[in-house]
Amino acid sequence: MNKTLKIILIVLSLCVVAACGLTFAGLIHLGNLLEARPEIIAASPTEPARQTDTPIALPTQSLEPEELNAIQANLEVLLAVAVPINDPIDLAERLGGKENVPLTLPDPDAPYQVGEEKTFWVTNTDNNENFQVQATLRYVGENIYFWIENGVRYKDSDLQQLAEDFDQEIVPTNREFFGMEWNPGVDDDPRFYVLYARGLGASLAGYFSSADELHPAAHPYSNAHEMFLLNADTVRLSEDYIYGTMAHEFQHMIHWYQDRNEETWVNEGFSMLAEHVNDLNSGGFDFDYVINPDLQLTDWGAETGENGPHYGASYLFMVYFLDRFGEEATKALVANSENGFTGLEGVMQALGILNPTTGQVYTANEVFTDWVIANYVQDPTVEQGRYTYRSYTPYAVSISDSISSCPDQITSDVSQFGVDYIEIDCPGTHTLSFKGGAFANILPFEAPPSGDYFFWSNLGDESNMFLTQTFDLTQVTGEAVLSFKTWYDLEEDYDYVYVSASTDGKHWQILDSLTCTTENPSGNSYGCGWNGSSGGWIEERVNLSGFAGTEVTLGFDYVTDAAVNGIGMALDDFRLDAIGYASDLEQDAGGWKGAGFVRLMNALPQTYSLSVISVGRQTSVQNISLDADNSTVFEVTIGGDVEKIVLVVSGTTPFTREKAPYQVEVR
């Protein structure tokens, strides 16, 4: 998806500390959305209702030693793989058939003066329609041009106040904290653009489109300016939250230049943090998160209108990180070129930040664990402020389940890098046992078409994973068809996989397949590509007869844009009968090479974070270690100074969106 967006969340009844109003935030999938904010009744944990339906069964996951070694090898391979950043110019030339695409398009009409007019491409996010609007320049600042679509009503005093505050206050603050945008950039103009326009859709307050950073030869809907848009249908220039929207979208512009394929949850967390460090209203979405914290922090939703909790989670994590580790560490995290938790661990290592419990450099999982504990504890007196926020007071988290009568047991599951809070308050000394699963599937299917091994494309934003192999067809005179099995889940209308062929390594031809599509509503596609969902494993065929008599190199390219991505593509069971080639990938990679794509089994070692919070006269926290089979048994005493305990459970397996099963028994 090429749009970095701010969704509208209408607050129907949000009156906290005598403040009521509308809130906005975020990076969303394009679509028709108007979310209603639920009423906040109290800032305290909600009492869970015990479910009476059939609980989730904890699967039997017995593995042989060689299987354990294989899934551990999967993890090591994935940890070692660097997902390549896409190169829009290379893609436009290699797959789009363009030649000598320039990096920049200097604007011969710049600098502009107030009153001049200009035409811009904009996107209606309700229907993904791209269209043009005519706008007039209404403000020129030291750093910005502020354009307003012709016919849009506004007060000049509101414009002047907003534009001056943004130009003189927010822009310098963002640059000092998050870095510099591409400047003078694609248009060779030191000022960047803000466009206030209508028709952008009912679901957003504004968006930054990375397509605008490209030469129009590389993307048909590029404006070829550093810019972001504000939605005149949904936000007024006089309203407070538009200031936060501008800080938010400007951070996305900066981070596109600084670290283009950063994971969405991190990039979005930084944009929420931009509102925070500018002392602007970032509130609201944290409530969406804490009412159901079993949400994967490290993922981002594909469904329009369902990302409010993701904004809240990313915001809280980044504010906690800033409060806990300070401005130097947070700026180092922003500047780190590694993505996600890999970048976080790089910062911990570089700055020598130690976990006070272990005395060793913090791991990302340990920081995550401290954060989910802090969201419950929120007490600066516990372990020298390890489990609290200093610059913001979040709402209290909701309890996932509770045990008030012992013995009892719970069988459930939890998201990877999500969290369940289980309250136990039956008095007495009890034996508590925990049992987790042994492994997690990477992709949501049980097995590939044959054997155990297949290729997986991996996943990432603004990325280009590829897989290639050269076939000798010089002795072929008749039909040559490559067949293979594939499974895919790709962001609809925005991310595509292509298969292409070249006889010289320079000029490539995208090939048709049985299920590829030429539809291109976003302007992202270079030709017939796979998009959307396959609905399961399917057989594909690509005709190579036109290359008979030559050596031909085939390539699979998975090209993603910003913000949202599916789980990717899987490939298996290749056959090219014309030359007697066949590979089910069981013994080796079958001659395929590439970057980003990995050959693996559909399993990773399941790991967990387990902690116990003792609540009473004095709150304390204990991190619980698990045995090799993800189980443990220990005693807890409730009574006297301890009124209850809270079990904090998280899955911590990377690279998957599948949940982690577990069972808790108190006896």
Locate predicted features.
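N-terminal Sec-pathway targeting helices
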Residues: 1-16
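Juxtacatalytic substrate-recognition/specificity segment
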Residues: 140-266, 270, 279-303
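Extracellular beta-strand-rich recognition modules
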Residues: 480-488, 552-559, 585, 647
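Beta/coil-rich, acidic/histidine-enriched accessory regions frequently appended to metallopeptidases
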Residues: 24-35, 54, 60-62, 340-467, ...
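Terminal, low-complexity interaction segments
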Residues: 534-566
